[in-house]
Amino acid sequence: MKKQLILCLFLLSLLMISTFVTNADDNDNEIYEEEEDFTTNRDVKQRGLVRENVSAKQIINNYNKYFKNVDIKNFEQGNTLVYITPWNGKGYDVATKWAKKFTHISPVWHQVKFENNKVMIEGDHNIDKKWMEKVKENSDQKSKILPRFSFEGQQWGSKESFQKYIDPKLIDSLVSTVKKNNYDGLVIEGIVHINKQLRDPFLISLSEKLHSIGKEIILVIYPFRQKGQETGFGAKDFELLSNHIDGVSLMTYDFGPSGGMNAPKVWVEDNLKFLLPNGENKNSKKIFMGIPFYGYKIGENDQSDAIVGSEFISVLKQNKSKKLKFDQNTHEHIFTYKNKKNQQVSMTYPSLLFIEDRIQLANKYKVSISIWEIGQGLDYFMDLL
């Protein structure tokens, strides 16, 4: 009886060992440690998943499995800003679970509008105090919550309108909203294109008032699509304002969705060079280089449609035998398949290598990163951050 028991225990141990991860370099059917909570003992790099040669089956087998220590921060060169949208609840969950990886978290909550001859700050209904408390708790009070305030409407588009509506009262209202809700600051979008003679004093005054109460301000800026294109914000603007504000969020995505290009690596790098013509400087870290966690589907109905992680995985599951192609020019993975109407469709969606390539760019230029938006990605992306 004792020998039978020992034999049973030996066979059981062999069965457990057989579930361990094998090298993924040449094996699309990677065996992984399957646990109920989807955690693994090795991150995506250790599992050999950050590579050009990727199949649908490999992604399906691994996308929801992440390294068990969610507190380890792998991108340490700069800060990490992540956006969250109210209409995508997954982002809130990601922000709380991996809170220690994110230095700045920006929920898209507020709008600044002009109605009935007065400026209004809207969005209080989006505020989630319990979630804010959870983020603070999980990050040991280190993650900063800076909701986005988007200036919306045509009146912000002209010098005359901006001059009329921007006054100390608006600055006081913005500061009051930040203070009242115990935010760590704000991300401001929608004014970068305004006349600099009005924009810059406004931003400097706002930043001074926020800094006086220990709060931060980050400005959203747009990339150029072609060299020489006017963006409203260049190297001289960054040199001036970076001495006053806490950062600029550079939206290096949506380069050419209709052509299947979301954020070509060379284009992202060109935008960094545009802001840093002399290379890195003391304020380089204040540039939050944008990395998209969404992609595009091209070919259906002759248009391009944005896709998020769940949609990407759904398509892969219907086309398990296919492989992705890595474009050496854009450094993006492309997946091509035929839909139910027999139309050829192409998808470009971030891969692990796509993200790693852009993180290495951030390391090269000593800048920070920003992600739009965290809920649209796949869980194993977090291993790289």
Curated annotation (Swiss-Prot):
Gene3D superfamilies: 3.10.50.10, Glycosidases (3.20.20.80). It is found in: Secreted. It comes from the Eukaryota. InterPro entries: Chitinase_II/V-like_cat, Chitinase_insertion_sf, Glyco_hydro18_cat, Glycoside_hydrolase_SF. One of its GO terms (cellular component) is endomembrane system. Its main location: secreted. GO terms for molecular function: chitin binding; oligosaccharide binding. This is Chitinase domain-containing protein 1.
